[in-house]
UniProtKB/Swiss-Prot annotation:
Annotated Gene Ontology cellular component terms: cytoplasm; plasma membrane
Identification of the protein by name: Putative PIP5K1A and PSMD4-like protein
Protein source organism: Homo sapiens (Human)
SUPFAM superfamilies reported for this sequence: SAICAR synthase-like, vWA-like
InterPro entries associated with the record: PInositol-4-P-4/5-kinase_C_sf, PInositol-4-P-4/5-kinase_core, PInositol-4-P-5-kinase_N, PInositol-4/5-P-5/4-kinase, PSMD4_RAZUL-like, VWF_A, vWFA_dom_sf
Annotated GO biological process: phosphatidylinositol phosphate biosynthetic process
């Protein structure tokens, strides 16, 4: 709701977010801009009188305040605005940041205060205002109280990170201030400017790596330069953006390091802001008075801050060399699209000032992740970081493949056409496993017509095969081997991390192609049955167990990306270790399946493979093998291995042979490894919907609802056993017999059903809106539904569960409806405008206020 505050004229005006509007609807931010410049002028001047010294911890908590009356004072000049107070947070610490980025205090002062700040028309959804300095060097943004508070807590760690590595895509903060006027606190932060106004931006994206509700709204599209989102990017640029290999490696390395920093602070839901300048389009555009400044008409002013451009923010060595034909990158990262057009990319990570614990309170309850809250708090930011990096480095940014020589093109084209056949169309054939003369083999064939990519000479349809790559370029290749069960699966993935894993015949390398395929397999298996578990084992000489069996695919993927090529593949030993890992955890209704990715020559002879297959057959173990990259060497051996496993039935185990191509994961989709023997894709909505939730639409919700109900069932059974044992002890009856305990459990269960269990919500009978309301109530009321106490959790180790923190967090969330609204907008499946949710938020806010008043009264009585 809009509130009314007095302003300079004495007339009440409306206040929406940080933006003040008068009765005519016009924005009146000139007073705010003037107050900011007056305050910064005084702060920089007073800071120059302080001696330079090492930064101490107390410097991060220092707050300086100065009052600016309208008539002026001994320390402040007179002005025509309302009287205001200006606060400066951690001035000494921020002075160190200036020095780190090569900014002199007089340059900082001149940029921000020599000329009026320029207001940008694109304000945030929360009502935040954006100003840019006249020289395009700095951005001034208004932030919420929670964001400013979080930045204060972030500063010590931020200081350490920048001290170790000033080249980062994270926001570079140069100052945090607060203007107190008219009974309101307006907090502002000064940052580096990612998008210079001197370069015309043709399109802009805000990317998270998610597809849920990630499309620009119609209102956003009507803006002069709209900010598009992930689905728009996948539609507009499906092939991604192509960078030189050195630039791509430097960018991905910087993203990985920055995401690790954000993960350590438990920050998630950040985005990559990317604005694209098309050099070829700019040269063809006619110049006019209405056109924005083009590249040729106005050059950027000299930079005052180091490492402030996108190109400087990644590795410095990537600035030299490469194949891009631009004379002046103007701070942008050179790239190409699939048409071969030259681009300049201006990128940076944004929206990092949101504490993860508030989102966790709502989102985790909505997802019904009840137990092991501390583990979830640590792993979910890690999973988000892993997902974010994967999307950026594999989908958004890609390497420009090397050009083979004409003679090598001829050789690769002839060998490729022999694989593809004469039709010229893509085809996938599957031959079922049978004993005898039939071989168990799946082959993916594809042929690319010549001339398809004539518009993009630097983007090739196929990377040259291994034998045609120069000797100086290492080419390792990945392989994995997972374990799966048919009804309830416990999957151990055996990863081939031998020396062949860097080969580039699978894009971008065998190792990364394997990682994407393992990701697809693990998600398919866990979605087909939420009780399935997955493990990860390497197939190198050591056969290292990276993760034990777990349903957390985020943990699997996190470990997966730490694998580096080394040594040789030990196929037999790896399969044996995977079998032992599964056998140790096998349940009565579990079937064991191993899925092995093999991307290196198998040195084990056929005799040993057949012997191993016979042993596995006795143990009723099925093995699926994805053979890629070395099909000519491995196919005969692995076919004999799989045929021995299948025996006379000819079913159960599978061998998939995939020749080099653009996507290993896509080649597996239609095969029985994912689709099952019946051909229905596992984990993609083929089964009936439990709890009224489509697993393909929201797999996480389907999983956690099932886990939640299973945990409740187990808890009730355990309580029934304890109660039965206590009753038997009182009656003097021995409790050693299993039949007696089972009877007691049955009676207790029947008794509970008769009298009902009032502490737990009945999710099966709730509508979607009621489930959302219930989740919000659970998140803010703690243990009311019997969810806070668990014998498996050490209460002292759980995060944010202490009572004082709970009261403070709940109070802050409920007293900041704008923040709560922004959190709800980012939750999957939640419509914040739904009447049921709005009523729930209102009732929770009023309840939180009543509880706080009640607690204060009790404290006063004491």
């Amino acid at each position: 709701m809009a509130s009314e505050v007095p302003y300079a004229s004495g007339m009440p005006i409306k206040k929406i977010g940080h933006r003040s509007v008068d009765s005519s609807g016009g924005t009146t931010s000139s007073a705010l801009k003037g107050a900011i410049q007056l305050g910064i002028t005084h702060t920089v001047g007073s800071l120059s009188t302080k001696p330079e010294s090492d930064v101490l911890m107390q410097d991060f908590h220092m707050v300086e305040s100065i009052f600016f009356p309208s008539e002026g004072s001994n320390l402040t000049p007179a002005h025509h605005y309302n009287a205001f107070r200006f606060k400066t947070y951690a001035p000494v610490a921020f002075r160190y940041f200036w020095e780190l980025f090569g900014i002199r205090p007089d340059d900082y002062l001149y940029s921000l205060c020599s000329e009026p700040l320029i207001e940008l028309c694109s304000s945030g959804a929360s009502g935040s205002l954006f100003y840019v300095s006249s020289d395009d060097e700095f951005i001034v943004k208004t932030v919420r109280h929670k964001e400013a508070e979080f930045l204060q807590k972030l500063l010590p760690g931020y200081y350490i990170n920048l001290n170790q590595n000033p080249r980062t895509l994270l926001p570079k903060f140069y100052g945090l201030y607060c203007v107190q006027t008219g009974g309101k606190n307006i907090r502002i932060v000064v940052m580096n400017n990612l998008l210079p106004r001197s370069v015309k931006m043709h399109i802009k994206y805000d990317l998270k790596g998610s597809t849920y509700r990630r499309r620009a709204s119609q209102k956003e599209r009507e803006k002069p330069l709209p900010t598009f989102k992930d689905l728009d990017f996948l539609q507009d640029i499906p092939d991604g953006l192509f960078l030189d290999a050195d630039v791509h490696n430097a960018l991905c390395k910087t993203l990985q390091r920055d995401c690790l920093v954000l993960q350590s602070f438990k920050i998630m839901d950040y985005s990559l802001l990317m604005s694209i300048h098309n050099i070829d389009h700019a040269q063809r555009e006619p110049l006019s008075s209405e056109t924005q400044y083009s590249v040729d008409t106005r050059r950027p002013a000299p930079q005052k801050a180091l490492y402030s451009t996108a190109m400087e923010s990644i590795q410095g060595e990537a600035r030299r060399g490469g194949t891009m034909e631009t004379d002046d990158h103007m701070g942008g990262i050179p790239a190409r699209n699939s048409k071969g057009e030259r681009l300049l990319l201006y990128i940076g990570i944004i929206d990092i000032l949101q504490s993860y614990r508030f989102v966790k309170k709502l989102e985790h309850s909505w997802k019904a992740l009840i137990h092991d809250g501390d583990t979830v708090s640590v792993h979910r930011p890690g999973f988000y970081a892993e997902w974010f990096q994967r999307f950026m480095c594999n989908t958004v940014f890609k390497k420009i493949p090397l050009k083979p020589s004409p003679s090598k093109k001829l050789r690769s084209g002839s060998s490729f056409s022999q694989r593809a056949g004469s039709s010229g169309n893509s085809c996938i054939t599957y031959q079922p496993l049978v004993s005898g003369e039939h071989k168990a083999q799946v082959t993916t064939k594809a042929e690319v017509e010549p001339g398809v990519h004539l518009g993009c000479p630097d983007v090739l349809p196929q990377t040259p095969p291994l034998e045609e790559i120069s000797e100086g370029s290492p080419t390792p290749d990945p392989s994995f081997s997972p374990l799966v069960e048919e009804t309830l699966q416990m999957l151990t993935t055996s990863v081939d991390n031998s020396e062949y894993m860097g080969n580039g015949d699978f894009l971008p390398t065998r190792l990364q192609a394997q990682q994407d395929a393992v990701n697809t397999v693990c998600h398919s298996k866990t979605r087909s049955n939420p009780e399935n578990n997955v493990g990860l084992i390497t197939l190198d000489n050591d056969c290292e167990v990276l993760t034990t069996l777990t349903p957390d695919t985020g943990r699997i993927l996190s470990k997966l990306h730490t694998v580096q090529p080394k040594g040789k593949i030990t196929f037999c030993m790896g399969i044996h270790v995977a079998h032992l890992a599964l056998k140790h955890r096998q349940g009565n209704n579990h079937k064991i399946r191993i899925i092995a990715f093999v991307g290196n020559p198998v040195e084990d002879n056929e005799k040993n493979l057949v012997k191993l297959a016979k042993c596995l057959k006795k143990e009723k173990v099925n093995v699926d093998i994805i053979n890629f990259g070395e099909e000519e060497v491995n196919t005969e051996k692995l076919t004999a291995f799989v045929n021995t496993l299948n025996g006379k039935d000819g079913t159960g185990s599978h061998l998939v042979t995939v020749p080099p191509g653009p996507s290993l994961a896509d080649a597996l989709i239609s095969f029985p490894i994912l689709a099952g023997e019946g051909g229905a894709m596992m984990g993609l909505g083929a089964s009936d919907f439990e709890f009224g939730v489509d697993p393909s639409a929201d797999p996480e919700l389907a999983l956690v609802l099932r886990v939640f109900m299973e945990e409740q069932r187990q808890r009730q059974e355990e309580e029934a056993r304890q109660a039965a044992a206590a009753s038997a002890a009182e009656a003097g009856i021995a409790t050693t017999g299993t039949e007696d305990s089972d009877d007691a459990l049955l009676k207790m269960t029947i008794s509970q059903q008769e009298f009902g269990h009032t502490g737990l919500p009945d999710l099966s009978s709730m509508t979607e809106e009621e489930k959302i309301v219930c989740a919000m109530q659970m998140s803010l009321q703690g243990a009311e539904f019997g969810l806070a106490e668990s014998a498996d959790i050490d209460a002292s180790s759980a995060m944010d569960t202490s009572e004082p923190a709970k009261e403070e967090d709940d109070y802050d969330v409920m007293q900041d409806p704008e923040f709560l609204q922004s959190v709800l907008e980012n939750l999957p499946g939640v419509d914040p405008n739904n009447e049921a949710i709005r009523n729930a938020v209102g009732s929770l806010a009023s309840q939180a206020t009543k509880d706080s008043k009640k607690d204060k009264k009790e404290e006063d009585k004491k």
